[in-house]
Protein backbone atom coordinates (compact mmCIF):
# COMPACT_ATOMS: atom_id res chain seq x y z
CA UNK A 1 0.00 0.00 0.00
CA UNK A 2 1.41 3.38 -1.02
CA UNK A 3 1.71 5.90 1.80
CA UNK A 4 0.56 9.46 1.07
CA UNK A 5 3.14 11.90 2.42
CA UNK A 6 1.50 15.30 2.02
CA UNK A 7 1.28 18.06 4.59
CA UNK A 8 -2.40 18.02 5.69
CA UNK A 9 -2.55 21.79 5.60
CA UNK A 10 -2.16 21.73 1.82
CA UNK A 11 -5.62 20.15 1.51
CA UNK A 12 -7.17 23.13 3.27
CA UNK A 13 -5.20 25.66 1.23
CA UNK A 14 -6.28 23.94 -1.97
CA UNK A 15 -9.84 23.93 -0.66
CA UNK A 16 -9.61 27.69 -0.09
CA UNK A 17 -8.71 28.24 -3.74
CA UNK A 18 -11.58 26.05 -4.92
CA UNK A 19 -14.06 27.71 -2.53
CA UNK A 20 -13.25 31.14 -3.96
CA UNK A 21 -14.33 30.07 -7.46
CA UNK A 22 -17.04 27.54 -6.55
CA UNK A 23 -20.75 28.45 -6.66
CA UNK A 24 -22.20 29.92 -3.47
CA UNK A 25 -24.14 26.77 -2.60
CA UNK A 26 -21.10 24.53 -3.02
CA UNK A 27 -18.54 26.44 -0.96
CA UNK A 28 -19.55 24.95 2.41
CA UNK A 29 -19.35 21.48 0.85
CA UNK A 30 -15.89 22.28 -0.49
CA UNK A 31 -14.81 23.49 2.95
CA UNK A 32 -16.14 20.34 4.62
CA UNK A 33 -14.50 17.99 2.09
CA UNK A 34 -11.18 19.82 2.39
CA UNK A 35 -11.34 19.57 6.19
CA UNK A 36 -12.16 15.85 6.05
CA UNK A 37 -9.25 15.32 3.64
CA UNK A 38 -6.94 17.16 6.05
CA UNK A 39 -8.12 14.96 8.92
CA UNK A 40 -7.46 11.84 6.85
CA UNK A 41 -3.98 13.04 5.91
CA UNK A 42 -3.23 13.72 9.58
CA UNK A 43 -3.44 9.97 10.24
CA UNK A 44 -1.74 8.75 7.05
CA UNK A 45 2.04 9.27 7.23
CA UNK A 46 4.25 7.33 9.59
CA UNK A 47 6.27 9.22 12.18
CA UNK A 48 9.42 10.87 10.86
CA UNK A 49 10.53 13.46 8.33
CA UNK A 50 9.27 13.40 4.77
CA UNK A 51 10.26 15.21 1.55
CA UNK A 52 13.07 17.38 2.91
CA UNK A 53 15.06 19.45 0.42
CA UNK A 54 17.64 22.24 0.33
CA UNK A 55 16.67 25.86 -0.30
CA UNK A 56 19.03 28.88 -0.17
CA UNK A 57 21.53 26.66 1.58
CA UNK A 58 19.10 25.58 4.30
CA UNK A 59 17.41 22.25 4.90
CA UNK A 60 13.64 22.65 4.50
CA UNK A 61 11.31 19.99 5.96
CA UNK A 62 7.70 20.60 4.85
CA UNK A 63 6.41 17.48 6.63
CA UNK A 64 7.58 16.18 10.00
CA UNK A 65 5.22 13.96 11.93
CA UNK A 66 5.53 12.99 15.57
CA UNK A 67 3.14 12.68 18.50
CA UNK A 68 3.15 16.42 19.22
CA UNK A 69 2.40 17.51 15.66
CA UNK A 70 -0.22 14.78 15.23
CA UNK A 71 -2.12 15.83 18.37
CA UNK A 72 -2.33 19.46 17.27
CA UNK A 73 -2.87 18.45 13.64
CA UNK A 74 -5.89 16.30 14.48
CA UNK A 75 -7.22 19.11 16.68
CA UNK A 76 -6.88 21.74 13.95
CA UNK A 77 -8.51 19.48 11.36
CA UNK A 78 -11.46 18.86 13.69
CA UNK A 79 -11.88 22.59 14.35
CA UNK A 80 -11.83 23.18 10.61
CA UNK A 81 -14.67 20.66 10.22
CA UNK A 82 -16.65 22.54 12.89
CA UNK A 83 -16.15 25.85 11.08
CA UNK A 84 -17.20 24.28 7.78
CA UNK A 85 -20.40 22.96 9.39
CA UNK A 86 -21.05 26.32 11.03
CA UNK A 87 -21.03 28.19 7.73
CA UNK A 88 -23.34 25.92 5.75
CA UNK A 89 -26.20 28.47 5.89
CA UNK A 90 -24.49 31.70 6.81
CA UNK A 91 -21.20 32.62 5.29
CA UNK A 92 -20.02 34.81 2.46
CA UNK A 93 -17.56 33.41 -0.06
CA UNK A 94 -14.61 35.51 1.14
CA UNK A 95 -15.06 34.45 4.77
CA UNK A 96 -15.13 30.78 3.83
CA UNK A 97 -11.87 31.15 1.93
CA UNK A 98 -10.27 33.13 4.76
CA UNK A 99 -11.23 30.51 7.34
CA UNK A 100 -9.78 27.73 5.19
CA UNK A 101 -6.53 29.68 4.77
CA UNK A 102 -6.47 30.37 8.52
CA UNK A 103 -6.85 26.67 9.29
CA UNK A 104 -4.59 25.55 6.44
CA UNK A 105 -1.76 27.87 7.41
CA UNK A 106 -1.88 26.79 11.06
CA UNK A 107 -2.06 23.11 10.11
CA UNK A 108 0.83 23.45 7.66
CA UNK A 109 2.93 25.15 10.34
CA UNK A 110 2.26 22.35 12.84
CA UNK A 111 3.72 19.78 10.44
CA UNK A 112 6.66 21.95 9.33
CA UNK A 113 10.05 20.79 10.53
CA UNK A 114 12.10 23.95 10.00
CA UNK A 115 11.97 27.66 10.79
CA UNK A 116 11.40 28.75 7.19
CA UNK A 117 8.37 26.53 6.58
CA UNK A 118 6.92 27.28 10.01
CA UNK A 119 7.07 31.06 9.77
CA UNK A 120 5.83 31.10 6.16
CA UNK A 121 2.78 28.98 7.02
CA UNK A 122 2.14 30.80 10.30
CA UNK A 123 2.13 34.20 8.62
CA UNK A 124 -0.21 32.94 5.92
CA UNK A 125 -2.57 32.00 8.74
CA UNK A 126 -2.05 35.42 10.32
CA UNK A 127 -3.01 37.26 7.13
CA UNK A 128 -6.19 35.20 6.98
CA UNK A 129 -7.00 36.09 10.60
CA UNK A 130 -6.54 39.78 9.84
CA UNK A 131 -8.71 39.52 6.73
CA UNK A 132 -11.55 38.00 8.79
CA UNK A 133 -11.71 41.26 10.73
CA UNK A 134 -11.21 43.53 7.74
CA UNK A 135 -14.09 41.78 5.94
CA UNK A 136 -16.50 42.90 8.66
CA UNK A 137 -18.67 45.94 7.94
CA UNK A 138 -18.17 47.52 11.38
CA UNK A 139 -15.45 50.15 11.63
CA UNK A 140 -14.40 48.85 15.08
CA UNK A 141 -13.72 45.40 13.59
CA UNK A 142 -11.66 46.85 10.74
CA UNK A 143 -9.69 48.99 13.19
CA UNK A 144 -9.02 45.90 15.31
CA UNK A 145 -7.91 44.10 12.16
CA UNK A 146 -5.14 46.66 11.70
CA UNK A 147 -4.13 46.34 15.35
CA UNK A 148 -4.02 42.57 14.99
CA UNK A 149 -1.86 43.02 11.91
CA UNK A 150 0.53 45.13 13.98
CA UNK A 151 0.75 42.55 16.76
CA UNK A 152 1.30 39.67 14.37
CA UNK A 153 3.80 41.67 12.31
CA UNK A 154 5.76 42.16 15.53
CA UNK A 155 5.59 38.41 16.10
CA UNK A 156 6.87 37.78 12.57
CA UNK A 157 9.78 40.20 12.92
CA UNK A 158 10.78 38.68 16.25
CA UNK A 159 10.56 35.14 14.88
CA UNK A 160 12.56 35.89 11.74
CA UNK A 161 15.22 37.71 13.75
CA UNK A 162 15.41 34.85 16.22
CA UNK A 163 15.56 32.31 13.41
CA UNK A 164 18.45 34.21 11.83
CA UNK A 165 20.36 34.17 15.13
CA UNK A 166 19.59 30.48 15.70
CA UNK A 167 20.66 29.51 12.18
CA UNK A 168 23.88 31.44 12.66
CA UNK A 169 24.53 29.72 15.98
CA UNK A 170 23.67 26.15 14.96
CA UNK A 171 24.19 26.21 11.21
CA UNK A 172 20.79 24.60 10.57
CA UNK A 173 17.16 25.68 10.32
CA UNK A 174 15.55 22.71 12.09
CA UNK A 175 12.80 23.75 14.50
CA UNK A 176 13.90 21.85 17.58
CA UNK A 177 14.83 22.54 21.20
CA UNK A 178 15.75 26.20 21.85
CA UNK A 179 17.11 28.10 24.82
CA UNK A 180 15.70 31.49 25.87
CA UNK A 181 19.15 32.35 27.18
CA UNK A 182 20.47 32.80 23.64
CA UNK A 183 19.52 35.80 21.47
CA UNK A 184 17.77 33.62 18.91
CA UNK A 185 15.89 31.58 21.48
CA UNK A 186 14.76 34.68 23.38
CA UNK A 187 13.43 36.37 20.24
CA UNK A 188 11.53 33.27 19.10
CA UNK A 189 10.10 32.86 22.61
CA UNK A 190 8.79 36.43 22.47
CA UNK A 191 7.34 35.83 18.99
CA UNK A 192 5.47 32.72 20.08
CA UNK A 193 4.39 34.53 23.23
CA UNK A 194 2.59 37.15 21.14
CA UNK A 195 0.58 34.40 19.45
CA UNK A 196 -0.11 32.51 22.67
CA UNK A 197 -1.19 35.62 24.58
CA UNK A 198 1.63 36.23 27.06
CA UNK A 199 0.95 39.07 29.54
CA UNK A 200 0.60 42.43 27.72
CA UNK A 201 0.32 40.63 24.36
CA UNK A 202 -2.96 39.07 25.49
CA UNK A 203 -4.86 42.27 24.66
CA UNK A 204 -5.06 41.41 20.95
CA UNK A 205 -7.13 38.32 21.79
CA UNK A 206 -9.63 40.04 24.05
CA UNK A 207 -10.25 42.67 21.37
CA UNK A 208 -10.21 40.43 18.29
CA UNK A 209 -12.63 37.78 19.53
CA UNK A 210 -15.56 40.19 20.22
CA UNK A 211 -15.04 42.06 16.94
CA UNK A 212 -14.99 39.02 14.67
CA UNK A 213 -17.94 36.97 13.47
CA UNK A 214 -18.95 33.89 15.44
CA UNK A 215 -16.92 31.53 13.24
CA UNK A 216 -14.12 34.06 12.76
CA UNK A 217 -13.68 34.60 16.49
CA UNK A 218 -13.66 30.86 17.13
CA UNK A 219 -11.10 30.31 14.37
CA UNK A 220 -8.78 33.14 15.43
CA UNK A 221 -8.85 32.04 19.07
CA UNK A 222 -8.33 28.36 18.27
CA UNK A 223 -5.69 28.45 15.55
CA UNK A 224 -3.58 31.47 16.50
CA UNK A 225 -3.27 30.85 20.23
CA UNK A 226 -2.86 27.08 19.94
CA UNK A 227 -0.23 27.52 17.24
CA UNK A 228 1.70 29.58 19.77
CA UNK A 229 1.27 26.84 22.38
CA UNK A 230 2.47 24.24 19.88
CA UNK A 231 5.58 26.30 19.10
CA UNK A 232 6.39 26.64 22.80
CA UNK A 233 5.96 22.89 23.31
CA UNK A 234 8.21 22.24 20.31
CA UNK A 235 11.03 24.56 21.33
CA UNK A 236 10.91 25.21 25.07
CA UNK A 237 9.75 22.07 26.87
CA UNK A 238 11.08 21.98 30.42
CA UNK A 239 12.18 25.62 30.55
CA UNK A 240 11.33 27.04 34.00
CA UNK A 241 10.69 30.50 32.53
CA UNK A 242 7.43 29.20 31.09
CA UNK A 243 6.24 28.05 34.51
CA UNK A 244 6.24 31.60 35.85
CA UNK A 245 4.79 33.06 32.66
CA UNK A 246 2.00 30.49 32.77
CA UNK A 247 1.27 31.32 36.42
CA UNK A 248 1.03 35.02 35.56
CA UNK A 249 -1.43 34.20 32.78
CA UNK A 250 -3.72 32.33 35.18
CA UNK A 251 -4.08 35.06 37.81
CA UNK A 252 -4.93 38.56 36.56
CA UNK A 253 -6.91 37.50 33.45
CA UNK A 254 -9.12 35.38 35.71
CA UNK A 255 -10.15 38.52 37.61
CA UNK A 256 -10.88 40.33 34.35
CA UNK A 257 -12.89 37.35 33.13
CA UNK A 258 -15.15 37.46 36.18
CA UNK A 259 -15.64 41.24 36.09
CA UNK A 260 -15.96 41.80 32.33
CA UNK A 261 -19.45 42.72 31.14
CA UNK A 262 -18.93 41.66 27.51
CA UNK A 263 -19.22 37.87 27.58
CA UNK A 264 -17.08 37.44 24.45
CA UNK A 265 -14.27 39.42 26.10
CA UNK A 266 -14.80 37.38 29.26
CA UNK A 267 -14.42 34.25 27.15
CA UNK A 268 -11.17 35.59 25.69
CA UNK A 269 -9.79 36.20 29.18
CA UNK A 270 -10.85 32.69 30.13
CA UNK A 271 -8.92 31.32 27.17
CA UNK A 272 -5.83 33.20 28.35
CA UNK A 273 -6.21 31.55 31.77
CA UNK A 274 -6.43 28.06 30.26
CA UNK A 275 -3.53 28.79 27.91
CA UNK A 276 -1.50 29.76 30.97
CA UNK A 277 -2.16 26.32 32.44
CA UNK A 278 -0.85 24.70 29.24
CA UNK A 279 2.26 26.90 29.19
CA UNK A 280 3.03 26.17 32.83
CA UNK A 281 2.77 22.44 32.09
CA UNK A 282 5.18 22.87 29.16
CA UNK A 283 7.55 24.61 31.55
CA UNK A 284 7.43 21.65 33.94
CA UNK A 285 8.55 19.55 30.97
CA UNK A 286 8.17 16.01 32.32
CA UNK A 287 6.67 13.42 29.94
CA UNK A 288 3.40 13.49 31.89
CA UNK A 289 3.36 17.30 31.89
CA UNK A 290 3.91 17.47 28.12
CA UNK A 291 1.09 14.99 27.60
CA UNK A 292 -1.08 17.06 29.95
CA UNK A 293 -0.34 20.28 28.04
CA UNK A 294 -1.30 18.70 24.70
CA UNK A 295 -4.42 17.07 26.14
CA UNK A 296 -5.51 20.31 27.78
CA UNK A 297 -5.01 22.19 24.52
CA UNK A 298 -7.20 19.62 22.77
CA UNK A 299 -10.01 19.64 25.32
CA UNK A 300 -9.98 23.38 25.96
CA UNK A 301 -10.08 24.27 22.27
CA UNK A 302 -13.12 22.09 21.61
CA UNK A 303 -15.02 23.71 24.47
CA UNK A 304 -14.02 27.26 23.61
CA UNK A 305 -15.05 26.80 19.98
CA UNK A 306 -18.54 25.83 21.19
CA UNK A 307 -18.71 28.82 23.54
CA UNK A 308 -17.42 31.26 20.92
CA UNK A 309 -19.97 30.04 18.37
CA UNK A 310 -22.76 30.16 20.94
CA UNK A 311 -21.96 33.70 22.06
CA UNK A 312 -21.74 34.72 18.43
CA UNK A 313 -25.25 33.32 17.95
CA UNK A 314 -26.41 35.16 21.07
CA UNK A 315 -25.01 38.41 19.71
CA UNK A 316 -26.71 37.89 16.36
CA UNK A 317 -30.01 36.99 18.04
CA UNK A 318 -30.10 39.57 20.85
CA UNK A 319 -27.94 42.28 19.30
CA UNK A 320 -25.48 42.22 22.20
CA UNK A 321 -23.21 39.90 24.18
CA UNK A 322 -23.13 42.01 27.35
CA UNK A 323 -24.16 40.30 30.58
CA UNK A 324 -25.84 43.48 31.82
CA UNK A 325 -28.24 43.39 28.85
CA UNK A 326 -28.86 39.65 28.44
CA UNK A 327 -30.89 36.97 30.16
CA UNK A 328 -33.78 34.62 29.52
CA UNK A 329 -32.48 33.27 26.22
CA UNK A 330 -32.82 29.62 27.28
CA UNK A 331 -36.53 29.83 26.47
CA UNK A 332 -35.96 30.70 22.82
CA UNK A 333 -32.53 29.02 22.36
CA UNK A 334 -32.85 25.81 24.42
CA UNK A 335 -30.55 23.67 22.26
CA UNK A 336 -27.80 26.29 22.29
CA UNK A 337 -28.16 26.68 26.05
CA UNK A 338 -27.77 22.92 26.57
CA UNK A 339 -24.66 22.76 24.36
CA UNK A 340 -23.14 25.75 26.18
CA UNK A 341 -23.68 24.03 29.53
CA UNK A 342 -21.81 20.92 28.35
CA UNK A 343 -18.89 23.00 27.04
CA UNK A 344 -18.80 25.08 30.22
CA UNK A 345 -18.74 21.96 32.38
CA UNK A 346 -15.83 20.67 30.29
CA UNK A 347 -13.85 23.85 30.95
CA UNK A 348 -14.55 23.37 34.65
CA UNK A 349 -13.25 19.78 34.46
CA UNK A 350 -16.52 17.98 35.16
CA UNK A 351 -16.43 14.15 34.90
CA UNK A 352 -17.52 12.58 31.60
CA UNK A 353 -16.15 15.54 29.64
CA UNK A 354 -12.88 16.05 27.78
CA UNK A 355 -11.94 18.72 30.31
CA UNK A 356 -11.92 16.13 33.07
CA UNK A 357 -9.67 13.81 31.05
CA UNK A 358 -7.13 16.59 30.46
CA UNK A 359 -7.34 18.27 33.86
CA UNK A 360 -6.69 14.97 35.63
CA UNK A 361 -3.41 14.72 33.71
CA UNK A 362 -2.53 18.34 34.53
CA UNK A 363 -3.17 17.93 38.26
CA UNK A 364 -1.09 14.74 38.42
CA UNK A 365 1.75 16.31 36.42
CA UNK A 366 1.95 19.36 38.71
CA UNK A 367 1.65 17.22 41.82
CA UNK A 368 4.55 15.02 40.69
CA UNK A 369 6.64 18.10 39.88
CA UNK A 370 6.51 19.10 43.57
CA UNK A 371 5.90 22.79 42.84
CA UNK A 372 3.47 23.97 45.55
CA UNK A 373 3.03 27.50 44.16
CA UNK A 374 2.29 26.20 40.69
CA UNK A 375 -0.17 23.67 42.06
CA UNK A 376 -1.97 26.37 44.04
CA UNK A 377 -2.11 28.58 40.93
CA UNK A 378 -3.66 25.68 39.04
CA UNK A 379 -6.28 25.18 41.75
CA UNK A 380 -7.08 28.90 41.55
CA UNK A 381 -7.37 28.63 37.76
CA UNK A 382 -9.83 25.74 38.14
CA UNK A 383 -11.88 27.80 40.56
CA UNK A 384 -11.85 30.76 38.19
CA UNK A 385 -12.94 28.51 35.32
CA UNK A 386 -15.90 27.34 37.37
CA UNK A 387 -16.76 30.93 38.28
CA UNK A 388 -16.53 32.69 34.94
CA UNK A 389 -17.11 29.87 32.43
CA UNK A 390 -19.22 27.18 34.06
CA UNK A 391 -21.43 29.63 35.96
CA UNK A 392 -21.20 33.19 34.65
CA UNK A 393 -21.52 32.69 30.88
CA UNK A 394 -24.43 30.18 30.87
CA UNK A 395 -26.29 32.01 33.63
CA UNK A 396 -25.86 35.55 32.31
CA UNK A 397 -26.79 34.69 28.74
CA UNK A 398 -29.46 32.03 29.16
CA UNK A 399 -30.81 31.64 32.69
CA UNK A 400 -30.68 35.09 34.31
CA UNK A 401 -33.91 37.10 34.46
CA UNK A 402 -34.53 38.72 31.10
CA UNK A 403 -33.63 42.41 31.15
CA UNK A 404 -35.60 43.05 28.00
CA UNK A 405 -37.96 41.10 25.82
CA UNK A 406 -35.92 38.51 23.87
CA UNK A 407 -36.30 38.54 20.09
CA UNK A 408 -38.53 35.94 18.52
CA UNK A 409 -37.01 35.65 15.04
CA UNK A 410 -35.61 32.32 13.96
CA UNK A 411 -32.00 31.39 13.39
CA UNK A 412 -30.04 28.99 11.24
CA UNK A 413 -29.47 25.33 12.12
CA UNK A 414 -25.89 25.02 10.85
CA UNK A 415 -24.24 26.70 13.89
CA UNK A 416 -26.08 24.26 16.14
CA UNK A 417 -24.85 21.37 14.01
CA UNK A 418 -21.26 22.56 14.42
CA UNK A 419 -21.68 22.98 18.18
CA UNK A 420 -23.33 19.56 18.43
CA UNK A 421 -20.39 17.95 16.61
CA UNK A 422 -17.93 19.57 19.03
CA UNK A 423 -20.05 18.60 22.02
CA UNK A 424 -20.17 14.98 20.90
CA UNK A 425 -16.37 15.02 20.77
CA UNK A 426 -16.21 16.60 24.24
CA UNK A 427 -18.41 13.91 25.75
CA UNK A 428 -16.81 11.15 23.69
CA UNK A 429 -13.30 12.00 24.88
CA UNK A 430 -14.61 12.32 28.43
CA UNK A 431 -16.25 8.89 28.35
CA UNK A 432 -13.38 7.17 26.50
CA UNK A 433 -10.23 9.24 27.16
CA UNK A 434 -7.99 6.47 25.86
CA UNK A 435 -8.72 7.66 22.31
CA UNK A 436 -7.03 10.98 23.07
CA UNK A 437 -4.29 9.54 25.26
CA UNK A 438 -2.98 7.37 22.40
CA UNK A 439 -1.91 10.48 20.44
CA UNK A 440 -0.25 12.42 23.23
CA UNK A 441 3.47 13.28 23.24
CA UNK A 442 6.04 12.09 23.84
CA UNK A 443 4.58 8.54 23.94
CA UNK A 444 1.08 7.09 24.27
CA UNK A 445 -0.12 7.71 27.83
CA UNK A 446 -1.35 4.93 30.08
CA UNK A 447 -3.47 6.81 32.56
CA UNK A 448 -6.81 6.13 34.21
CA UNK A 449 -8.55 9.36 35.26
CA UNK A 450 -11.60 7.59 36.66
CA UNK A 451 -10.44 6.38 40.04
CA UNK A 452 -12.17 7.41 43.23
CA UNK A 453 -9.35 9.65 44.42
CA UNK A 454 -9.29 11.78 41.28
CA UNK A 455 -13.07 11.87 41.03
CA UNK A 456 -13.33 13.04 44.62
CA UNK A 457 -10.68 15.72 44.03
CA UNK A 458 -12.51 17.11 41.01
CA UNK A 459 -15.89 17.07 42.72
CA UNK A 460 -14.42 18.86 45.73
CA UNK A 461 -12.83 21.50 43.50
CA UNK A 462 -16.01 22.11 41.56
CA UNK A 463 -18.34 22.22 44.56
CA UNK A 464 -15.94 24.42 46.55
CA UNK A 465 -15.62 26.86 43.67
CA UNK A 466 -19.38 26.99 43.15
CA UNK A 467 -20.01 27.60 46.88
CA UNK A 468 -17.32 30.29 46.91
CA UNK A 469 -18.97 32.05 43.97
CA UNK A 470 -22.39 31.85 45.63
CA UNK A 471 -21.01 33.23 48.90
CA UNK A 472 -19.16 36.01 47.09
CA UNK A 473 -22.35 36.95 45.22
CA UNK A 474 -24.40 37.06 48.41
CA UNK A 475 -21.81 39.20 50.20
CA UNK A 476 -21.25 41.36 47.08
CA UNK A 477 -17.55 40.47 47.04
CA UNK A 478 -17.84 38.99 43.56
CA UNK A 479 -16.93 41.59 40.91
CA UNK A 480 -20.38 42.34 39.49
CA UNK A 481 -20.74 43.09 35.81
CA UNK A 482 -21.25 46.75 35.06
CA UNK A 483 -22.00 48.34 31.70
CA UNK A 484 -18.83 49.53 30.03
CA UNK A 485 -15.35 48.19 29.34
CA UNK A 486 -12.65 47.31 31.84
CA UNK A 487 -9.34 49.13 31.80
CA UNK A 488 -6.64 46.75 30.65
CA UNK A 489 -3.09 47.38 29.48
CA UNK A 490 -4.39 48.27 26.03
CA UNK A 491 -5.70 51.55 27.45
CA UNK A 492 -2.08 52.48 28.11
CA UNK A 493 -0.92 51.19 24.72
CA UNK A 494 -3.65 53.01 22.79
CA UNK A 495 -3.55 56.08 25.07
CA UNK A 496 -0.34 57.64 26.45
CA UNK A 497 2.05 55.37 24.56
CA UNK A 498 0.27 55.93 21.25
CA UNK A 499 0.23 59.67 21.94
CA UNK A 500 3.98 59.52 22.60
CA UNK A 501 4.54 57.68 19.32
CA UNK A 502 2.49 60.31 17.49
CA UNK A 503 4.47 63.15 19.05
CA UNK A 504 7.73 61.45 18.13
CA UNK A 505 6.48 61.04 14.57
CA UNK A 506 5.51 64.72 14.41
CA UNK A 507 8.92 65.69 15.77
CA UNK A 508 10.68 63.55 13.19
CA UNK A 509 8.53 65.11 10.47
CA UNK A 510 9.38 68.59 11.71
CA UNK A 511 13.09 67.83 11.68
CA UNK A 512 12.75 66.43 8.18
CA UNK A 513 10.90 69.54 6.93
CA UNK A 514 13.43 71.83 8.61
CA UNK A 515 16.25 69.89 6.96
CA UNK A 516 14.65 70.13 3.52
CA UNK A 517 14.14 73.89 3.86
CA UNK A 518 17.67 74.50 5.14
CA UNK A 519 19.47 71.53 3.64
CA UNK A 520 22.70 73.20 2.57
CA UNK A 521 23.19 75.39 5.64
CA UNK A 522 22.32 72.52 8.00
CA UNK A 523 24.72 70.18 6.21
CA UNK A 524 27.48 72.77 6.49
CA UNK A 525 26.72 73.15 10.20
CA UNK A 526 26.93 69.40 10.79
CA UNK A 527 30.17 69.25 8.80
CA UNK A 528 31.75 71.98 10.92
CA UNK A 529 30.52 70.41 14.18
CA UNK A 530 31.73 66.94 13.15
CA UNK A 531 35.11 68.33 12.14
CA UNK A 532 35.37 70.20 15.42
CA UNK A 533 34.54 67.02 17.35
CA UNK A 534 37.11 64.99 15.44
CA UNK A 535 39.78 67.60 16.06
CA UNK A 536 39.23 67.27 19.80
CA UNK A 537 40.44 63.69 19.86
CA UNK A 538 44.02 64.70 20.72
CA UNK A 539 43.14 67.57 23.08
CA UNK A 540 42.86 67.58 26.88
CA UNK A 541 39.85 65.94 28.47
CA UNK A 542 38.42 69.18 29.91
CA UNK A 543 38.29 70.80 26.47
CA UNK A 544 36.69 67.65 25.10
CA UNK A 545 33.98 67.80 27.73
CA UNK A 546 33.37 71.50 27.11
CA UNK A 547 32.98 71.08 23.38
CA UNK A 548 30.90 67.98 23.94
CA UNK A 549 28.44 70.08 25.91
CA UNK A 550 28.25 72.54 23.02
CA UNK A 551 27.63 69.69 20.59
CA UNK A 552 24.79 68.38 22.73
CA UNK A 553 23.36 71.88 22.93
CA UNK A 554 23.38 72.16 19.14
CA UNK A 555 21.64 68.79 18.76
CA UNK A 556 19.06 69.72 21.41
CA UNK A 557 18.40 72.96 19.58
CA UNK A 558 17.81 71.09 16.33
CA UNK A 559 15.35 68.78 18.09
CA UNK A 560 13.53 71.78 19.59
CA UNK A 561 13.27 73.37 16.15
CA UNK A 562 11.78 70.13 14.87
CA UNK A 563 9.13 70.20 17.61
CA UNK A 564 8.30 73.82 16.81
CA UNK A 565 7.95 73.21 13.09
CA UNK A 566 6.00 69.90 13.54
Predicted regions and their residues:
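Cytosolic juxtamembrane amphipathic/interface segments immediately preceding
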Residues: 58-60, 325, 404-405, 530-542
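Hard-cation-handling environments
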Residues: 411-465
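Alpha-helical transmembrane segments and their helix-start/interface "positive-inside/aromatic belt" motifs
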Residues: 24-34, 144-149, 331-339, 410-422, ...
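Aromatic-capped, Gly/Pro-kinked transmembrane alpha-helices
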Residues: 436-456, 477-566
